[in-house]
Amino acid sequence: MEATVLLVTDSITLSSKVVTWAIQEFKEKADRGNNLCVLTQANSLEWKSYFSSSSLDVVVFFSEKCEFHKQNLVVELARILKPGGAVFIQTLVSMEDGTTKIHASLEHSLLLAGFVRPEVVASVEGLASSDGLELFALRAQKPTWETGSSFSLKKKSVQKQESLPKPGALSVKPEMNVDLEDLIDEESLLSEEDLKRPPLPSASDCEVSTKRKACKNCTCGRAELEEKQTKLGLTVEQLNNPQSACGNCGLGDAFRCSSCPYKGLSPFKLGEKVSLPGTLLTADM
């Protein structure tokens, strides 16, 4: 049966207390030591060819050197671990330096190698120590995915909108209950101003063209205007757009000559319509 738990140390021997601890700590993976492998004198990486990538569930590394945590070693531990596998590293630390420095350095190396959730744990008794040194242990986990792996994102299923019925497809006609008392009399909406007869159009608004005479029963005032024009001997053009060769026709009778066609009319402005007085047709007494 292939090993799933690996104990690695850079010393010549490994204490039996450490082996016992590993069997108890990783009981299911170690299977009472049947799936446990111990590797000593692992000063170099010559042993990396012993294990294929992603083949171990747990790797425990014990070191008697304060400077053991080289980046290439941590990367190798990440390679041989399965996704979701755990790594446990215990080393000696100088009491003068304290654990802060080694903690930051080792945690940085683990994160760069791809491990997650590094945390300080209780150290294992049985590792030889010298005066002025103390034990320090750190544990981390390999992510549950492989480096370079890919997976497809699941798209949420979009439910098709129910098609709306086409116009005229409904066979059920709505019932309309109309109360006759609710109907409004249209005549009640008209005011007295609306009922008044509109004013008759002025002579200028009559539909009769300028070249035709007023109708027989003219009521718009056009016949009266034509009668005034006949009495004065002026054309419609002379009244609507009066012009003067001498420039005195619009000033009044005091300035007009004896043959002026506008003689007898009130003063007016040249180019503007001449207004005829209402007493023009009144007989002189």
From Swiss-Prot:
[4Fe-4S] cluster binds at C246, C249, C257, C260. This is Anamorsin homolog 1. [2Fe-2S] cluster binds at C206, C215, C218, C220. Monomer. Residues 246-260 are annotated as: Fe-S binding site B. One of its GO terms (cellular component) is mitochondrial intermembrane space. Its cofactor is [2Fe-2S] cluster; [4Fe-4S] cluster. GO terms for biological process: iron-sulfur cluster assembly. A motif (Cx2C motif 2) lies at residues 257-260. It is found in: Cytoplasm; Mitochondrion intermembrane space. One of its GO terms (molecular function) is 2 iron, 2 sulfur cluster binding. Keywords: 2Fe-2S, 4Fe-4S, Cytoplasm, Iron, Iron-sulfur, Metal-binding, Mitochondrion. InterPro entries: Anamorsin (IPR007785), Anamorsin_N_metazoan (IPR049011), CIAPIN1 (IPR046408), SAM-dependent_MTases_sf (IPR029063). Residues 150-195 are annotated as: Linker. Residues 1-150 are annotated as: N-terminal SAM-like domain. The C-terminal domain binds 2 Fe-S clusters but is otherwise mostly in an intrinsically disordered conformation. Component of the cytosolic iron-sulfur (Fe-S) protein assembly (CIA) machinery. Required for the maturation of extramitochondrial Fe-S proteins. Part of an electron transfer chain functioning in an early step of cytosolic Fe-S biogenesis, facilitating the de novo assembly of a [4Fe-4S] cluster on the cytosolic Fe-S scaffold complex. Electrons are transferred from NADPH via a FAD- and FMN-containing diflavin oxidoreductase. It comes from Picea sitchensis (Sitka spruce). Residues 206-220 are annotated as: Fe-S binding site A. Belongs to the anamorsin family. A motif (Cx2C motif 1) lies at residues 246-249.
